[in-house]
């Protein structure tokens, strides 16, 4: 069975966009039983910018509970916290010593984020190498990524090939799995932009922690066009198309089926429907989340996942140490 690695960074706020674009597709992928899946909380990656310590700690636990509440099955997905596996940073250092500055500085995200300030951390430059360590220590075959992250998987491949050539076969060569993850959900107020968990305008973003009344209010206030006909046309009707995508995922109904029912009903009726089905679905998730949050089940799941992760990483690290001359 091929091994697949994916991560979640505990920053910002989990949104409906995260659920539809990343969490639900992960659940669906796990249910195919085609892959051995590892899911890690990328808390070390979060430190490339300052995080308030208590808030970060709290968010890590909440994110794990929410992923589980959304249907991630720990019997099918190995879940662990990145920083709990201390072999990973050690592996990362050896990989850094086999990575060129030019490679790291060419990463598009580094170029973009380093423009915003003069005093960015070295971690912003080197975190793609830490990402390579995340991928390579467990010999992942596939890493599901969007187009913007593909470059980082390609760097991991280059590092692995170089290390193998220099020191002998050590790493499996991973491949990016370019995801069309579910549907990209747009901001309710600005349907030309994706719904972001760091969005400054909360009225356009549905959080998985929002109250049902707030969810309904936000959807009723979603930006739409003026012709009052419900049909799918992302170019000319981005707002309504976004709501159709949301309703389709929330209910399991096809977009054609929804259009058939609501095409001539008017936007008010359609928005009310979308608001109610979305609020109901998120309420179900929140009920599971509240039961999980302070339960011992999370600790048991994380301990089990960490043990597997450590066993894989220790074996890889000892092999690397021997090959580079450290023992």
Name what the model sees in each region:
Residues 52-53, 143-146, 230:
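Short, polar/flexible loop-turn hinges at active-site or ligand-entry regions and domain interfaces
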Residues 107-163, 167, 187:
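Internal, conserved structured core segments that host functional sites
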Residues 2-5, 10-133, 277, 286:
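N-terminal Rossmann-like or analogous alpha/beta NTP/dinucleotide-binding catalytic cores
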Residues 8-10, 43-45, 141-142, 199, ...:
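Short, histidine-centered active-site or binding-site loop motifs used for metal coordination
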Residues 151, 157-327:
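Conserved nucleotide- and phosphate/pyrophosphate-binding catalytic cores
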Residues 101-105, 137-144, 248-258:
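Short helix-capping/linker segments at secondary-structure and domain boundaries
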Residues 64, 71, 99-102, 140, ...:
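A generic secondary-structure signal for well-formed alpha-helical elements
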Residues 40-43, 139, 181:
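A secondary-structure boundary/capping signal
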